[in-house]
Amino acid sequence: MLRDIINLLKKDNLQAQALAECHEMLSMCEQMVAASVESLRRRDDATVDVDILTMDKKLNAFERDVRRKVMTHLSLGNTSDLTAGLVLISIVIDIERIGDYSKNIHDLATVHPDKLHGGSLEDDVAHVERDTLEILSRASKAFTEGDEELARELMAEYKDDISGRTRDMERALVAEGVITDSRQATALALYLRFLKRISAHARNLASSVVNPFDRIGYPE
């Protein structure tokens, strides 16, 4: 799978342009996630440093353009690029969804304008938050540079750390009621779910570096 993607970098065609757009989308997603987290967790007025809505619309336009370029390229008979084209169509969905979840976090900030604190779960919330930002950055690097070793590390870390820790906190919030303020508990539950989904889509991106097309999003 990695070889198919790397080969695109050596070409100048519609599919290579689609790959470049995926790289640009990833850069935008990193900015959007970081800014939305800052807005929710560290500001009392929900201000955000980038235009989340405009960037989200641009991501949507990029997604459509990637699909269109891949379809056009393959329809011209470039069957040797079929696998790479299928990969791009698959992962561009994950990239666009990361943008959607960053918008969800910002939307949460606007209805919860106070800084969102994790209460007794703060250390764990902060841990998942840091890991999510890091896994997104490293997944982007693994995909852009074709780093198989880094991709494998990220796939293992998501399952061992983010997924399990988030599940434990969700249980504490819902079953054990460790946060008694319903507004805070609801906001935390939503935030954790958004972070978990961002991490999962980043993991899918990493899996595209090492897995065949039919196993993207699954263990190697």
Language model regions located:
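Cytosolic, long alpha-helical scaffolding segments
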Residues: 1-220
